[in-house]
Amino acid sequence: MEDLIEASHLPGVVLIELDGILTTQMSDVNDVHGIPMIWEDTGYTGEGSVVSIIDTGIDSNHVGLDDMDDDNSTNDSKVIAFYDAVNNPDKTNGTEIKAYDDQGHGTHCAGITAGTGAPDFVNIGVAPQAQLVGVKVLDEGGSGSFATVMAGMEWTVDKRHDFNIRAASMSLGGFGLIEWTSSEEESVNRMANEMVRSGVALFIAAGNSAISAQIGTPGSAEDVITVGALDKDTSIAVYSSQGPTEEGRVKPNIAFVGSSVMAPEANSGDGYVAYSGTSMATPGAAGLAALMYQANPDLSPFDIRNIMQETSTYRQCHYLLANEPCPEDLIPKNRQNNVYGHGHVEGLPALLEAANYVYGLNTDINLSVDSDLSEENRINLHPGESFAVSVQGSPMEVQWRTWDMRDNWMSHPNFLEGETNFEISHTMLVDRLQYLPGNQIEGNQTVIR
């Protein structure tokens, strides 16, 4: 009260009044990204998909997260497994502990991904018929050690087949927000990439440091889908962290509504609360992945990311709220920028593109690297060098791409049908990488098998 009286005496102050709080219902979030059109036009609601929420836990007693059909007489749990890396790290089978949340952040995220919206069905999650796996890596204060975060990520990879985990949401980390050593940060990023390569589409929050900080661990990991936050009008939220990463990598990948989002309030029974942050944007994007996996279970995590990126609506970045566009905006084929990534996510186009992905796999075709590999399965190419690959099975063509996930698959220029070998040269790698904006390539190149 004393502060208000003091403020009232400041020069120029005529009136002081309460500032009302505006909230965004989940129905509004879903509308922005076209989610209801998916439900209505295709019937996909996430059934059969499982998303891991790696966070503070999940309150599985909340009416929006306790079961699939909001009928207490049926035995159809929404949360099918739970691992507590903080307080019960030795209980690893996933069914020994009932899911809980002593902080609330994870429950909120879980509801955005797959909440049923009970009891009033206003704040329905993006994939309301998807199921969840809770992985508690943050304590009651919302903090997480290197050991617990790594344990939760490793557990998710180990149990991905047991519980059919296809996607994961991690709303944690950020530049300078978790006190890890550089070695620990590298390990977490490496584990994040390993999760993706093992078959889990991993969505990570960009962070809430706005324009003042880079995107840090684990959102800086190369293979993950880093998510920035939008306001309801699809403009970038003022708090949403912007790239590049410390390594110079362009991030985020995509942007999703994250401001003042209503979702389940932990330990309230049936209450809902509004939070803001890239933490709220990330589980929304993970929910869309659950819908896409229902439409096409054969998708890889890289397919999920590429489809979301390619179908997003590009937004000019306008660094520092300047009136002129930033360099990426001037490229004829708009590319990822450090504010919006590839743009704001468009749900229905992404879903339809996912449903149309068709795979024809011939297991008789094999590729093998003939050049010598290091102990880490790497080849270090110097300028002028190449590495050789043998082909078995008579493919019609060979396609390749660089390690940069913004790159596109392309046919090998010198491979003809019926040939049994081909080479990838240092020049080919450098030419492709330099084509992508933001890359400065020189010297040797390393190829990971």
Kindly give the residue locations of the regions a language model identified.
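Autoinhibitory propeptides
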Residues: 1-50, 66-69
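Subtilisin-like serine protease catalytic core
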Residues: 39-81, 89-147, 161-167, 197, ...
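Surface-exposed, flexible coil segments in extracellular/virion-facing regions
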Residues: 406-431
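Substrate-binding/access-modulating region of protease and related hydrolase catalytic domains
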Residues: 45-47, 60, 116-120, 134-223, ...
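Short proline/glycine-enriched turn/loop motifs at strand-loop junctions of beta-rich domains
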Residues: 258, 392-398
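Secreted peptidase-domain scaffold signal
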Residues: 182, 207, 336-338, 344-371, ...
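Extracellular S/T/G-rich loop segment that most often corresponds to the catalytic His/Ser-adjacent loop
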Residues: 76-88, 216-294, 298, 302, ...
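Hydrolase catalytic cores
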Residues: 110-113, 133-139, 168, 214, ...
